[in-house]
Amino acid sequence: MPTLKIRGAELYFDTYGEPVSGRDPILLIHGSYITGSVDWSGVAPRLAQEFQVIVPDCRGHGRSDDPAGRYSFREMAADAAALIRALGHKQAHVIGHSNGGNVALVTLMEHPDVVASCIPQAANAYVSADLVERIPKKLDPERVRVEDPSLMMEMIELHSARHGVDYWATLLRRTAAEIVSEPNYTALDLARVQRPTLVIEGEHDATNAPAAHGRFMAQHIQGSQLWIPVGIGHNVHTDAPAAWCERVLEFLRAVPALQRH
């Protein structure tokens, strides 16, 4: 089982493919309360035909521990940067989905030296009022236990072996607390970005489309691209994997390799 000690946590990760000369690897960051393999197994093999792909379980998720209980986008972004370096890479193409998209964005903002390019999908640069209103109710463990027991059982299956059978409720509470707190980037903050960026947001993403978070990021990150797939919701890469891979690989092929920067 491949693991590395990263900033006090034992992080599990999978790799797909071998290093490709002249091409930085891809780092895929999973979304809320799931794992890397659950989120990315449908697209990682296709990406690995052209790039090496690294897929970790974020701290406190799946097979990665979190002994200090430090759940935050900033902590996970620092982990991402440290993992890239620990694996011997100077940079990686950092792609994230949902809360993983937030982690990808924070990695871009706080650790730009390790980012060759960034693809935040279904992410938000700031905490909008609708998130504060909806998320604590949606992720309340008692509501989930009664109204969405399948989610509870999935979380128990994914996380209990490493973290205990009751950990799912703790993870939901930590996730909700972070979503209504971070990130908090302004238009001026985003204007500082100097890395190629592709923002992805499904047309019908119920989490982020109402506040037009994707458009906000793309509007203020200089030179960024925005892809809004028509008729798709929060999970573009699983709902339309072929189209997603085609668009992402088209973008990545155009990113100059590190040695040509």
Q: What name fits each language-model region?
A:
Residues 193, 199-201:
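Short beta-strand/loop motif that positions the catalytic acidic residue
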Residues 206-213:
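Conserved alpha/beta-hydrolase "acid-adjacent" motif
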Residues 102-110, 114-151:
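Flexible "cap/lid" loop of the alpha/beta hydrolase fold
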Residues 224-261:
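Catalytic active-site module of serine/aspartate enzymes centered on a nucleophile-bearing elbow/loop
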Residues 173-189:
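Active-site nucleophile elbow and catalytic-triad environment of alpha/beta-hydrolase enzymes
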Residues 9-63:
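Conserved HGGG/HGGXW glycine-rich cap/lid loop of the alpha/beta-hydrolase fold
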Residues 32, 203-206, 231-233:
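Acidic beta-to-alpha connecting loop that harbors the catalytic carboxylate
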Residues 41-48, 54-95:
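Active-site loop/oxyanion-hole signature of alpha/beta-hydrolase fold enzymes
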